[in-house]
Amino acid sequence: IESYHMYDSMVEVKRYFTKFGGHKLAAGLSMDRENLEPLRKALNEKAKLTEEDFIPKVHIDVPMPMEYANYNLAKELERLEPYGVGNPKPLFAQKDISFVEAKRIGANGNYAKFTVEMMPGGYPRKTDLMYFGDVDAFCTFLDEKYGAGSADHLFAGDKSYLLSITYQIGINSFRGRESLQYIMRNYC
């Protein structure tokens, strides 16, 4: 939770710890077991979180049509690595992209590979868009947005749907070949 400062909160209840340390986003501690419930109660009482604090926030670096994100840009972005909390991987956004087909991938079918259609220069071009999130939740969202059975139609490839997304780009290396890879992070 972005608005919750872990270390500052721990300082307020330090009497429950034998030792502790950390920063805004992470903390470590040692404590006696009998202090667990009093600690939980004290932290909950002192927390100044609102319902809005629990809503995940998405920070978009640049709204950018997918056709502008190319292999050369992905190679340039590699130079900014390593990515982490202080240096997040750039996140792009595009409104109203056409999802034309989908298939489950991965050993358990828990990921998805979508075929999306872009319109660079007014000419349609299809490309792959990977999704490593909760595919079942995506299907539920699609059915709620466009009606029951919509996800089945998309996976059958017989109906397309417009969605707005955030995405990242990277280089996929497979069998000695490199290619641009689009990865969806969020959708609405």
Please state what every model-predicted region is.
Residues 1-188:
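Acidic, two-metal ion nucleic-acid-processing modules in DNA metabolism proteins
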